[in-house]
């Protein structure tokens, strides 16, 4: 499903409104942390798991140590006071005449206001939308994002996508790992560009 620009703009506008409305967080929620810990470190410690990923840019295999070091600052970099969804993607958004509605919040946490935008953009690129870097920095919510913090968070979530793509599919979600692999490919390309 390629993104139509008007639909994408509706979601991007909604993400801006969401950040405004949910800062500070209106509920007590846990601080954002990387689900499952440090994924590049896991892949670094078990390099065979990366070698099996024929879809993965070879740059990753040559830079696992750098990627693991980059994700180490995730918790500090992701800190903030905004209630964030952490799983914005096309199937968690309803487009209405009054704007985007974000559904399915089981992983809500408190973090930086720009987290949802960053997490969302690899799936947009995967589904025929624009490349993420320009879209991220053109969005108003990115004005409060420090580039080093953004890079640490991008490294962390990219490691999550890539590592999860190597795992068996959970019951009832047979396409999840393929989706995460697609997110991972586009996130790796974004990360590689920023780490060049």
Predicted regions and their residues:
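Regulatory N- and C-terminal appendages and interdomain linkers associated
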Residues: 182-196
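Short proline/glycine- and basic residue-enriched helix-capping loop/turn segments at helix->loop/beta transitions
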Residues: 62-70
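Hydrophobic multi-pass inner-membrane translocation pores used for secretion
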Residues: 77, 89, 120, 145-148
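Hydrophobic/aromatic-rich alpha-helical bundle segments in the mid-to-C-terminal region
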Residues: 29-30, 168-181
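Active-site acidic catalytic loop and adjacent metal/ATP-binding pocket
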Residues: 69-115
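A cross-family kinase active-site recognition segment
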Residues: 1-61, 79-81, 109
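Active-site activation/catalytic loop segments of kinase-like enzymes and analogous catalytic loops
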Residues: 114-144, 154-172
